[in-house]
């Protein structure tokens, strides 16, 4: 199989993430995809960069899947970076290549297909999205195959989908963010996406908490930087020892987050239930 990872991070955010966790969002995706699909050929591009060469429709048809990463990019702002990312997604839809996105990746697909994204205001999901529940349509959708009736997932975002495009299917919600998972069809393309982050490790969750410490204080989710650091240290410790029941209990987490095979379930489902059947239809 041949995969293309499209990094939604602008250059400054990409380097800031590398400083805190050692890799960009696209590099995280590459590592996870190599584990989920050993032997797959994976390329990475950076559509937000002004100097980036964006593949056209025909070039995109040579891939079996396209993955869009998370990012602090605000899709509700008219910026050159946002326009480049949305233009890239238009090409993905036109190519008919199956696509998947997490966090900003979902928001990019939504806007490109005619939906809307907005800032969350004072609400936040920082660290983990709690009590995610599939909709009636979501319970039968292969993206969420194997997920329990209610589950948690890594999540870090300050924007959300305000309105899905026409014809999209809402698959999961919680009390903080209505659109947590969705299927979007546009032109020849099919996109499956989630607002949370099935691709990131607990170590990356801890790093994200540290990067967003000031924002957490501003919105009353922590009283001090020391509070944020204490939480990040617990998450780091659980990453190092995922079988520690005491840390999982203190953080209110179960195996849906602590076990990598469960945490990455949506990515695995996308490859098994959409990418491989589409590849077979194309005679590859």
Language-model segments: residues:
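N-terminal beta1-alpha1 cap of cysteine-dependent amidohydrolase-like domains
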Residues: 1-86, 91-95, 219-284
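A structural signal for short, well-ordered beta-strand segments and their strand-loop junctions
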Residues: 5, 42-44, 100-102, 172, ...
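Pocket-forming structural segment of enzyme catalytic cores
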Residues: 8, 115-208
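Short glycine-/acidic-enriched loop or helix-start segments at secondary-structure transitions
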Residues: 15-16, 54, 77-78, 110-112, ...
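Short, glycine/charged-enriched secondary-structure capping and boundary segments
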Residues: 18-21, 80-83, 113-117, 168-169, ...
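Active-site phosphate/pyrophosphate- and oxyanion-stabilizing loops and adjacent acidic/basic residues
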Residues: 27, 31, 107, 158-159
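Cysteine-nucleophile active-site neighborhood
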Residues: 71-138
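A glycine-centered loop/beta-turn motif at secondary-structure junctions
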Residues: 176-218, 222-224, 228-236, 240, ...
């Amino acid at each position: 199989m041949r995969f293309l990872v499209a990094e939604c991070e602008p250059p400054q955010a990409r380097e800031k993430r590398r400083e805190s966790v050692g890799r960009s969002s696209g590099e995280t995706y590459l590592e996870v995809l190599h584990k989920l699909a050993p032997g797959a050929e994976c390329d990475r591009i950076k559509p937000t960069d002004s100097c980036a060469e964006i593949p056209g429709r025909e070039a995109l048809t040579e891939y079996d899947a396209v993955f869009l990463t998370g990012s602090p990019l605000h899709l509700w702002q008219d910026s050159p970076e946002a326009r480049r990312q949305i233009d890239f997604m238009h090409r993905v839809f036109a190519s008919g290549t199956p696509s998947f996105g997490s966090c900003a990746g979902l928001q990019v697909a939504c806007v490109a297909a005619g939906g809307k994204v907005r800032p969350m205001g004072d609400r936040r999901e920082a660290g983990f999205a709690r009590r995610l529940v599939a909709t009636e349509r979501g319970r039968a959708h292969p993206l969420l195959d194997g997920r329990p009736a209610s589950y948690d997932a890594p999540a870090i975002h300050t924007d959300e989908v305000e309105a899905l495009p026409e014809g999209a299917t809402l698959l999961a919600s919680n009390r903080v963010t209505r659109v947590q998972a969705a299927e979007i069809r546009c032109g020849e393309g099919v996109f499956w996406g989630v607002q949370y982050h099935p691709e990131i490790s607990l170590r990356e969750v801890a790093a994200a908490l540290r990067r967003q410490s000031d924002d957490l204080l501003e919105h009353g989710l922590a009283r001090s930087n020391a509070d944020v650091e204490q939480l990040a240290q617990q998450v780091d410790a659980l990453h190092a020892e995922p079988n520690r029941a005491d840390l999982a209990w203190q953080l209110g987490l179960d195996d849906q987050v602590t076990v990598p095979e469960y945490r990455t379930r949506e990515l695995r489902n996308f490859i098994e239930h959409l990418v491989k059947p589409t590849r077979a239809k194309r005679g590859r």
